[in-house]
Amino acid sequence: IHVDVMDGIFVPGRTMPFKEMRKIYKYTSKRLDVHLMVEDASKLITKYANLNAEYITIHVESENVEQNLKLIKKYAIKAGIAINPETKVKELVPYLPLVDLILVMSVEPGKGGQAFLPKTKNKIKEISKLIQEHKSNGPVMEMKR
């Protein structure tokens, strides 16, 4: 189950509070794929790790990226990193050894109903090349719109 978590600061939208998510989650045994679109992910990583997350994805544009990726790994959860449409691909390089998933945003995060941004197709090609250059077993890439 993919869960978007938005704080209204990092992105304009907000999602339900964690305590509400916890209530809903008790009705399923499915593992979560958590996408944290928040300024400070460290506050939420532990909470979602304890909610049976399989993946937790943070943004390369957020705070304390390396520290937060290591925290995700500490819980034996697959770590993902998302990149916004306007962010340069080279920003991912320092984190490639720490991630299992790269999420390419094909819209501006935090708003629904947007049209696909065609320029993100080139970003996928760039990231694929980057993975080949910097890491033998690259992370999985997915696109979100």
Residue ranges and their predicted role:
Residues 2-71:
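N-terminal active-site wall of soluble small-molecule enzyme domains
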Residues 43-44, 53-140:
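Conserved anion-binding
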Residues 142-145:
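Glycine-rich beta-strand-to-loop/alpha-helix junction loops that act as flexible
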